[in-house]
Amino acid sequence: MKIDENTLLQLCNAAITAGNRVLDFYELDTEIIYKKDESPLTKADLDSNKILQSSISKITPNIPILSEEEFIAWNTRKNWKKYWLIDPLDGTKEFIKKNGEFTINIALIEYNQPVLGIIYAPALGCLFFPKKNSGSYKIYTKSNLDTLNNSEKISVKYKNKEKIIVLGSRSHSNVTFDNWVKNKFTDFEIIEKGSSLKFCEIAEGKADIYPRFGPTSEWDIAAGHIILLESGGKLKSIDNKDLVYNTKEDILNPHFFAYADDALIKN
């Protein structure tokens, strides 16, 4: 599916609108509910989901939507060739901590691969998106846009640097991650970052690699996946396979590396 500029603009504004609704709750003592997997859920997650579902359904009424907050059974979605994959509030733990590192994620999946991704960080007022085969972009805004012409093209910037900037999860660190980094690199700095912003940091050349040895779901990474690819980066499983979407009943990803250059994962 080819997404024209006007449709992309509408989708970006849907993410911004949802993000602004999330900000309405940001300074409040929001009630927290814990799901079966012990992950937190707030009214901000639910309201963002309603806005995204409604907006995207109007923009592309014939494309189904799979959301973290409205899971759809495998029997229903297993034959989908095209669908929207959304995370209405990625980084709920960061939202609760009030550190600003949470995002709205929208991705379009076609034939098990992301072809469009939008990431909006409402507390930072920063929007990321790709244009298929023509790069990834960012634009600063806290209100709906009339045009995307003022966006800035971004790209990975790794060039055999001496100090490697390694990104880690702010809420999901583990020993495997620490050991891998120490064994792989001599001179490095680990920066903890929440949500899909880790993909954006690599995509705009602020970091080099994000090794993930803990659980993630497909809606956590799909938007960041295509933004990273279009900026010149890569995302591979730890056994060097491409990641695919909606190929099985569960939506868990394998452990993976998101990175700027192949040299970062070579033995």
Describe the function of each predicted region:
Residues M1-A15, G19, T147, N179-K184, ...:
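Oxyanion/phosphate-interacting regions
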Residues V22, D45, I56, T92, ...:
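Residue-level signal for inorganic ion chemistry
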Residues M1-L89, E110, N144-L145, N179-K182, ...:
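N-terminal subdomain of lithium-sensitive/metallo-dependent phosphomonoesterases centered on the IMPase/IPPase/PAP
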Residues I106-F199, T247-N267:
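Acidic beta-strand-loop-alpha-helix segment within the catalytic core
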Residues L46, S171-H172, P215:
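Short, surface-exposed acidic/glycine-rich loop or hinge patches that mediate macromolecular interfaces
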